[in-house]
């Protein structure tokens, strides 16, 4: 019996390690980076991250093979879903101006292992995104020279007939990644200046495309004789919108750069809103122009926009578009290489990844080791994988990060901020609830006197409510919710919300096509999932939120992040099975890294004092007055069978 209790105690403590949250410093503006980026810098960085290969390559691929002219609708859906996610990023970026983006946001609200998995997937997202851009850059340059580069490579380097790999090695794409890596290592100020130059050229070319495109537009290209507006139907539109997410993944570079922003509280939300609005408008208008210029089924997926002008007899315009596309893709590549090492740095700085990647160059003030190593890995990916495989793999990691950031917004909105010096949840003795206190005469134990003083004030003065407590207006109807600690019901409700959203989207996606459910069971499952989803929203909504702050706050919480979670999960399920398989393999690799290194070297793990389990606790004897008798006592121990077992039993008794 004692052995079983010891083992269960060890397991409980280990699970507690996995879900610990990050302790924020009191001074969030303190950083080893150089805070030099303005709102304009961040906005152009975001535009550069979004408007690139997605505009010049992805539009042609999706229009021809997935959605047809209805790619316009696909971009609208993807833009709305991205807007919901972007607003979540904006709130976090303003409140937590630390590098790390989705990884950091998850760490301070959900827990360590989830943050590591999100960070691990964001690393993959940026590596694949940069490799895909380099592949697209190479393809566009090759099209200018009539595919002579490709033909030369196939003749002299040979071709590959290996599943999941490209048909031939792309040395040009690999080389451009290495060159961009060298530029990024010069520092944030130089990278920002270089991005300004390429972004200005790109935006000028986009204006040229829109003006010339509408002049050359042929409305009959959307007619039934050419296949109609939506030749692939609703399914094609939704599948296209899932892939279109690739076009918008660049906005999180703004949140990643928050530790280098001069005034992150204002600059981050403004830059995200402006850049996403401009990028969405550009994608919708350009995809409209493209499918109106030439029939969608005749598009060249590798260089759709330039080829469209060639086919209309404006070869000079095609050269301008090709040159502009190369500049635009340079901005995306720089954006990915700018963000990737900063995510790696954030994880290494927290102890979850190898410490060597936390080194910052004293002169350039950038994580140069992370830049060089992961820039090289990105160049290898661009060398051996083709664009289509890279793009599909990219979307799933992005959508998962968006989902966890949305959930993190809800959790953080309904809990007290945790700063350095405060106890982390789960490290203290459980505090009895008010109802438990009223219904028992047993003394109640706490690990600090301040814990009890805080709770006594809340028990005696119901008007003093903290985030996560039941609103006073709902106490007559939902009084049983007062039995739980502040934020506990919200945390459980967020889990229920995510599970019910996953069930609902799974039924909508697979219920008729894959599972072939009868109508009655299909309807019943949708109804039950919808009720669970709505019920969890209601339970969250009846609790107190944080008071309004001076920083940007997402409107309509929890509804807005809940919609973001639903849309993200729906789009994830529209991706192919092979994408999920590759994603699962990457997750397994990440778990191996975490359990072999991260969980033991985490700085939050080092914060746990070895003497924590033997400090004095306080016993509080209930009384009818505000002042209660408080007496310090020594830690409890149970009868021991050896010194080690006695110590472990004492720790288990406290927990």
What do the predicted segments below correspond to?
Residues 1-60, 64-72, 76, 82-87, ...:
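Membrane-interface "cap" regions at the ends of multi-pass membrane proteins
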Residues 28-34, 72, 148-174, 196-322, ...:
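Helix-loop-helix junctions that connect adjacent transmembrane segments
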Residues 34, 55-161, 275-278, 586:
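Extracellular loop-to-transmembrane helix junctions
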Residues 59, 98, 121-139, 243-261, ...:
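Membrane-helix boundary/coupling elements in multi-pass transport proteins
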Residues 104-105, 111, 142-154, 229, ...:
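TM-loop-TM module centered on a large, flexible mid-protein loop between adjacent transmembrane helices
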Residues 138, 168-219, 231-234, 272-276, ...:
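Membrane-interface loop-to-helix entry segments
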Residues 139-147, 200-227, 288-292, 402-421, ...:
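Hydrophobic alpha-helical segments and their helix-loop junctions in multi-pass secondary transporters
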Residues 165-169, 231, 357-366, 405-576, ...:
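C-terminal membrane-solvent junction of multi-pass transporters and transport-like membrane proteins
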